[in-house]
Amino acid sequence: MKIITCYKCVPDEQDIAVNNADGSLDFSKADAKISQYDLNAIEAACQLKQQAAEAQVTALSVGGKALTNAKGRKDVLSRGPDELIVVIDDQFEQALPQQTASALAAAAQKAGFDLILCGDGSSDLYAQQVGLLVGEILNIPAVNGVSKIISLTADTLTVERELEDETETLSIPLPAVVAVSTDINSPQIPSMKAILGAAKKPVQVWSAADIGFNAEAAWSEQQVAAPKQRERQRIVIEGDGEEQIAAFAENLRKVI
């Protein structure tokens, strides 16, 4: 059983600054980290490895220079995967969902897999598209919002997901792509032994050419900016008579 768990390196939101001049975001001081939602996918994959005999877990990511960071690689491997594959190329530096999914699908095909796990979304964009797009590109079943994995056999995965007013149980034929929600588990903090052992695990570094990737982005991002801040008007209306109520209503109309 070959399980691939996908993850994305995202900027640490605590260190993102806003340029006052134009509202653009400054990522220069923001270190990269594993997207919080993908930590759940990594944990789920490693829990399955404990249940399935001879299962192997491969962590997979596509991106830019953030994936060259040795500390980041060790962080991923210390959480349980047996090996790591990173696809590094400048074109993936700010990749959007369609491009990311196409690259992940190509890399997964090259690596081989029975099951692909990923987070429901990413901490930066949270587009909630990549998992389903990977399934569409590979022409295999894809399910999102999975909150519990019930069982795994050689050819079927049984899962649950919480809908608005019911719990849905699904049997999914393998190979398949499953996007998990944060309700599925609580990611463990790696032990010192796991952190030290991560340095001995294999890492494969591929380029876009290595996976035969030559797709162009369907659309391009023009700008990312923080919402413009409006100054508070600080209007105080004293009294509770009809005139004050009318003034209050008039001011509400101006801002709605």
Curated annotation (Swiss-Prot):
Keywords from the named record: Electron transport, Transport
Q: Which GO terms describe its molecular function?
A: electron transfer activity
Database matches in Gene3D superfamilies: HUPs (3.40.50.620)
Source species, domain of life: Bacteria
UniProt-listed HAMAP family: FixA (MF_01055)
Q: Which family does it belong to?
A: Belongs to the ETF beta-subunit/FixA family.
Role this protein plays: Required for anaerobic carnitine reduction. May bring reductant to CaiA.
Question: What name does this protein carry?
Answer: Protein FixA
- Protein species of origin: Escherichia coli (strain K12)
